[in-house]
Amino acid sequence: MKPLRFAVTPGEPAGIGPDLCLLLAADAQPHPLIAITSRDLLAERATQLGLAVSLLPVAPGQWPDLPAPAGSLYVWDTPLAAPVVPGQLDKANAAFVLETLTRAGQGCLDGHFAGMITAPVHKGVINESGIAFSGHTEFLAELTRTAQVVMMLATRGLRVALVTTHLPLRDVADAITAERVERVTRILHADMRDKFGIANPRILVCGLNPHAGEGGHLGREEIDIIEPTLARLRTEGMDLRGPLPADTLFTPKYLEHCDAVLAMYHDQGLPVLKYKGFGAAVNVTLGLPIIRTSVDHGTALDLAGTGKVDTGSLRVALETAYQMAENRP
């Protein structure tokens, strides 16, 4: 059987991404895991952290078939443009960050990697360098030529996908269209089936308005857009429940019988998930032809090089990527 290799990108070199990768090396992984970053950066950070990690070089055409031993980490060396000081951003390294993402994403497309796991980048410093960059998700959508992707956050026991993501609240209602709801629901359903191995996923769908519109008295999006769209998709055999009031849906009675929740907007679904899985949640990009998971936290510049970082989110991101790859047909 072909080995399942995975790429991990540490993201912003002055942040905690390199620290997280080094800390993960303490434990043997079930699959070969390759850090795409500067070997010198990892060596310097390991010294700063007082960690003894063996950095094993790999390159295209020399991919490992077996996991690295505990205390070791495979590294595909990617050169920095400028030296790195933990906690100090340098726009000179912006292109380096994007090169690591390109190598990981293209490696997935070419079949070298079964999936990629990303640590946080700093969008601001990349844009300050003169490179337009709105985030991992958009970057990978462009790289893979994917028209529509879906943001889903997950923790143990709960998955929440979003119809809209980073929009001001005043713009959300206008963005809830039948076309968008259908497109996002189809992607969520397909990836639950094909990447998570759930033959007939049960999806709970939030309404947009309080009390799911209260029969049209508190808004008509449920009546005019969401319910008709769900009804059409149910005729294809999709198990869709809703639209339900969010304050009803996010209760044990409902959640224990669902595989995923579809929320209409960012702050409708994610506060519940982050409360349930604080420090142990993962961001999954659905709709891509590749597997991509990510931590759910930022670069934490103030913690870089201190040894005071929590690997919980990265471990869940790894577990999720492994699970998705193992479930793919």
From Swiss-Prot:
Spell out the GO cellular component terms annotated for this protein, sorted alphabetically and separated by semicolons: cytoplasm
Reactions that this protein is recorded to catalyse: 4-(phosphooxy)-L-threonine + NAD(+) = 3-amino-2-oxopropyl phosphate + CO2 + NADH
Give the domain of life: Bacteria
Class of this enzyme: oxidoreductase
Residues annotated as binding substrate: 136-137, 274, 283, 292
Q: Which cofactor does it need?
A: Zn(2+); Mg(2+); Co(2+)
Which GO terms of type biological process are on file? pyridoxal phosphate biosynthetic process; pyridoxine biosynthetic process
**What Gene Ontology molecular function terms does this protein carry?**
4-hydroxythreonine-4-phosphate dehydrogenase activity; cobalt ion binding; magnesium ion binding; NAD binding; zinc ion binding
Q: In which pathway does it act?
A: Cofactor biosynthesis; pyridoxine 5'-phosphate biosynthesis; pyridoxine 5'-phosphate from D-erythrose 4-phosphate: step 4/5
**Enzyme Commission code:** 1.1.1.262
Q: Where is the signal peptide?
A: none
Which positions does UniProt annotate for a divalent metal cation binding?
166, 211, 266
Provide the primary localization. Answer: cytoplasm
Spell out the subcellular localization from the entry.
Answer: Cytoplasm
> Cofactor stoichiometry and binding?
Binds 1 divalent metal cation per subunit. Can use ions such as Zn(2+), Mg(2+) or Co(2+).
User: What additional remark is attached to this entry?
Assistant: The active site is located at the dimer interface.
- PANTHER family assigned: 4-HYDROXYTHREONINE-4-PHOSPHATE DEHYDROGENASE
On subunit structure and binding partners, the annotation says:
Homodimer.
Q: Which family does it belong to?
A: Belongs to the PdxA family.
Q: What does this protein do?
A: Catalyzes the NAD(P)-dependent oxidation of 4-(phosphooxy)-L-threonine (HTP) into 2-amino-3-oxo-4-(phosphooxy)butyric acid which spontaneously decarboxylates to form 3-amino-2-oxopropyl phosphate (AHAP).
Identification of the protein by name? 4-hydroxythreonine-4-phosphate dehydrogenase
Q: Which organism does this record belong to?
A: Pseudomonas putida (strain ATCC 47054 / DSM 6125 / CFBP 8728 / NCIMB 11950 / KT2440)
Name of the gene encoding the protein in the UniProt record: pdxA
